[in-house]
């Protein structure tokens, strides 16, 4: 009986399950759908020979992981009867995509899109998976191809006036003057700084400020005073101020204090506007310090944009952490743990790459900072999740395991590097597309046989052996170093430290190209022993310099010495030689910048040290400025074509770049008549942010005059460093014009130079009446941006001249004289008669009185 009940129960359950499954089965029934195919063209009309973007696809999108519709075909009927076909075309998940077409003949083209039958892989829009999308055609689109060119965005020229941040994103041309500085320069790092095409051509100072406003001692810097000739501390050696400066988006970031004390003492990061010197914010990052920066471009189907980070590093229990902070605010965003060791190399989109090679173990590894996030997302959500289109949104405020960033790990040949003393270790160089290694380093005497090799890290060639060579040491009992390398120029350079000679090799084959070069100053051997001096390759030239105080420049293809420059100590203050040391800072806009510094300088500092700018091609001196650089602190940096550097002479930061100006002009307010000389006067003043500092305002209550480029170094040292006022200071040129307010008539008044106070004067004699605008224009210089000012003057007609009688002729004079003479005779006779009559009258009166 119980068996029958069980059988009936099974039947009943089966019926229930069957009935309950009917709606689901019905809802999942496959369908056939005829899509709506579209085609558009941008631009339309289009100029013949120009590209047109065809927007093609269907109106129905796909659901992930179906990435889009496949194998669409674009058919273009040309006016000459021929047909062009674009195939295959695959859409994205929106159902559409773009393809490029370049018409070559004028006339109307007809564009049509064919959509082939295919399956719906993932249910979408109520269409079950497995449904069929029928084949379909778009309507034909008439594409007009014309001879007349189209109007395109004209582009924005580089600024001709003072400019500021932020820069409108439409001004793409300005990318060449808005450079960033992300990390210190050093061995095998490109010394050229793109994005600084207006790098300073004079030492004009924009602003000067102490590391900490209102600071004393090392933070205030300079002479300690109190009757002693010593200076406050500099941070050299080993301690260092202005640590690890970074420039991003027109802001310079740096560590406020020395690194000493690590997390046991207060540590702060400061953000300063590079153009104004204004302190934007100060942040304490759990007593960690700024190490380097990142400007990283993320582009995906969800998001496109640049992320700017300031990165602090720390090591806890042997684990290396990177903490990422927003550059705009200093706010912590996320962290990495277990970051592998290595040298940072910035990839094409700003991603940070690190390579590690283990020649004994026979492997080469690449780590990519971006991959940490993308792999974590795949690990957590799977490879098909749509969140992969975003960068960091769901991981803000978290710590990610950086081991996820290992992009590849490949096997390499064993035994590439011969054994060397353990204290020295093999020298390994990481470049943008290869790793190079040697069996020698500058730490010990080199072996008799020099061993050099290179492995590719380029995509598709990971771990490929490029060369593996040996070379008999031509200078035994000496130290050797792989001093410089350039993939672009195809050369790497070895130097023998003891002799300062160099040899050049082909970077792709290891073949010897040239050498030895001429010897350099013997003191350069000390430079090659240090990590603070290095040779570098730029634009086909090898640049070398150091403790000898001479810049040597060689043709990197031949080893021929092209030119030299001596950084002379003209005052004989330097105890290491007749020249100051040469510390290379960077190259920007074809100009080489370098300065003097020292590992552990004496106190007080030697006087007269310099920062120098040369033409990197010719070696011509462009400018030099009184300056003593730091060895252990932050080196000079450049961004937005502005240099920021710490000067140990007063422990202040100096910003060097082109400054704004203000022009004024005055003319008489009362009306002036034609022909009357008029005095026009005005000023051209430097209004850089530094001129508004109290210390400068008190010395220059009427403002700081703008001066000629050739006077700039001495003038800046006077204004900001309180050197004696230079003699024979030259002003700047001012152009003067007059413009009739009503007619627009233009008169060239001429021009003049300002004097050492910034004032100019011109005497002008108007020749035409009317209401005239007087325009004073300072056209700018290598030091200053231009400025102008206007005033007005009324010129009237001259007053009427008094009438002057016409001189009488001789005849008129004679006639007049005759008339006068005749009148004189008559008057004389009349006078006699009057006298006689008068006398007779008196006589008659007297006679009458006697009779009475």
Where are these regions (language model features)?
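Secretory targeting signatures
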Residues: 1-30, 56, 203, 330, ...
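Proline/serine/threonine-rich low-complexity linkers at boundaries of modular beta-sandwich domains
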Residues: 25-36, 655-662
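Short beta-strand segments of immunoglobulin-like
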Residues: 41-46, 667-672
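Structural beta-strand segments of beta-rich domains
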Residues: 50-54, 676-680
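Short flexible loop/turn segments that cap and initiate beta-strands
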Residues: 59-87, 207, 690-748
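Residue-level recognition of secondary-structure-to-loop junctions
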Residues: 92, 98-105, 109, 115, ...
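Enriched for extracellular/lumenal, surface-exposed ectodomains of secreted and cell-surface proteins
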Residues: 109-133, 768-786
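Repeat-blade elements of multi-bladed beta-propeller folds
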Residues: 160-185, 222-269, 287-322, 343-377, ...
């Amino acid at each position: 009986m119980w068996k029958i009940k069980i059988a009936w129960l099974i039947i009943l359950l089966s019926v229930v399950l069957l009935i309950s499954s009917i709606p689901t089965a019905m809802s999942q029934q496959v369908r056939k759908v005829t899509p709506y195919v579209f085609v558009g063209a941008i631009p339309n009309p289009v100029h013949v020979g120009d590209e047109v973007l065809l927007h093609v696809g269907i109106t129905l999108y796909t659901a992930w992981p179906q990435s889009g519709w496949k194998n669409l075909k674009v058919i273009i009927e040309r006016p000459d009867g021929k047909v062009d076909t674009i195939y295959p075309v695959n859409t994205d998940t929106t159902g559409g995509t773009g393809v490029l077409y370049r018409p070559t003949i004028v006339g109307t083209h007809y564009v049509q899109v064919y959509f082939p039958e295919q399956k719906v892989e993932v249910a979408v829009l109520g269409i079950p998976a497995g449904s069929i999308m029928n084949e379909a055609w778009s309507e034909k689109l008439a594409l007009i191809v014309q001879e007349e060119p189209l109007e395109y965005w004209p582009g924005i020229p580089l600024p001709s006036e003072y400019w500021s941040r932020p820069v409108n994103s439409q001004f793409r041309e300005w990318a060449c003057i808005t450079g960033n500085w992300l990390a210190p320069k050093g061995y095998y790092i490109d010394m050229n700084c793109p994005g600084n095409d207006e790098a300073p051509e004079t030492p004009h100072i924009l602003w000067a400020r102490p590391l900490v406003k209102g600071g004393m001692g090392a933070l205030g810097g300079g002479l300690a005073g109190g009757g002693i000739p010593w200076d406050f501390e500099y941070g050299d050696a080993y301690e260092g101020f202005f640590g690890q400066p970074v420039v991003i988006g027109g802001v310079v970031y740096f560590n406020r204090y020395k690194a000493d004390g690590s997390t046991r003492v207060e540590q702060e990061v400061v953000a300063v506007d590079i153009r104004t010197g204004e302190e934007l914010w100060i942040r304490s990052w759990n007593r960690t310090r700024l190490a380097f920066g990142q400007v990283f471009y993320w582009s995906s189907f969800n998001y496109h944009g640049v992320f700017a980070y300031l990165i602090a590093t720390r090591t806890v229990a042997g684990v290396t952490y990177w903490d990422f902070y927003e550059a705009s605010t200093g706010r912590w965003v996320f962290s990495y743990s277990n970051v592998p060791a290595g040298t940072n190399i910035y990839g094409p989109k700003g991603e940070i790459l690190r390579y590690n090679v283990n020649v004994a173990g026979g492997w080469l590894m690449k780590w990519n900072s971006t991959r940490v996030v993308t792999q974590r997302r795949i690990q957590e959500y799977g490879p098909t999740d749509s969140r992969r289109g975003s960068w960091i949104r769901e991981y803000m405020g978290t710590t990610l395991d950086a081991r996820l960033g290992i992009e590849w790990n490949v096997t390499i040949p064993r035994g590439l590097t011969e054994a060397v003393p353990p204290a020295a270790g093999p020298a390994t160089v990481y470049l943008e597309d290869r790793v190079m290694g040697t069996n020698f380093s500058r730490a010990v005497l080199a072996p008799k046989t020099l061993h050099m090799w290179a492995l590719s890290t380029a995509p598709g060639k990971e771990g490929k052996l490029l060369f593996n060579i040996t070379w008999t040491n031509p200078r035994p009992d000496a130290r050797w170093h792989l001093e410089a390398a350039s993939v672009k120029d195809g050369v790497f350079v070895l130097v023998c430290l003891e002799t300062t000679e160099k040899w050049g090799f082909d970077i792709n084959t290891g073949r010897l190209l040239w050498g030895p070069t001429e010897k350099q100053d013997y003191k350069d051997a000390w430079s090659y022993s240090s990590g603070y001096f290095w040779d570098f390759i730029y634009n086909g030239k090898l640049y070398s310099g150091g403790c000898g105080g001479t810049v040597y420049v060689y043709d990197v293809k031949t080893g021929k010495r092209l030119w030299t420059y001596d950084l002379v100590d003209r005052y004989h203050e330097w105890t290491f030689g007749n020249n100051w040391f040469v510390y290379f800072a960077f190259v920007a806009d074809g100009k080489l910048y370098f300065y003097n510094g020292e590992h552990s300088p004496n106190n007080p500092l030697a006087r007269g040290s310099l920062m120098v700018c040369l033409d990197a091609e010719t070696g011509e001196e462009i400018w030099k400025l009184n300056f003593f650089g730091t060895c252990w602190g932050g080196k000079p940096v450049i961004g937005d074509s502005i240099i920021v550097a710490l000067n140990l002479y007063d422990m202040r930061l100096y910003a060097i770049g082109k400054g704004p100006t203000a022009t004024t002009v005055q003319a008489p307010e009362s009306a002036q008549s034609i022909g009357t000389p008029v005095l026009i006067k005005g000023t051209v003043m430097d209004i850089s942010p530094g001129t508004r500092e109290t210390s400068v305002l008190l010395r220059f209550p009427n403002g700081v005059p703008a001066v000629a480029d050739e006077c700039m170094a001495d003038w800046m040292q006077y204004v900001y460093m309180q050197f004696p006022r230079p003699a024979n200071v030259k002003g700047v040129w001012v152009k003067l014009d007059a413009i009739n307010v009503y007619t627009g008539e233009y008169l060239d008044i001429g021009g003049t130079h300002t004097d050492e106070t910034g004032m100019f004067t011109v005497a002008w004699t108007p020749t035409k009446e009317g209401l005239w605008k007087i325009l004073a224009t300072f056209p700018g210089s290598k030091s200053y941006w231009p400025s102008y000012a206007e005033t007005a003057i009324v010129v009237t007609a001259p007053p009427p001249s008094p009438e002057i009688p016409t001189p009488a002729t001789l005849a008129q004079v004679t006639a007049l004289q005759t008339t006068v003479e005749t009148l004189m005779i008559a008057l004389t006779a009349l006078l006699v008669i009057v006298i006689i009559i008068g006398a007779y009258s008196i006589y008659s009166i007297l006679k009458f009185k006697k009779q009475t």
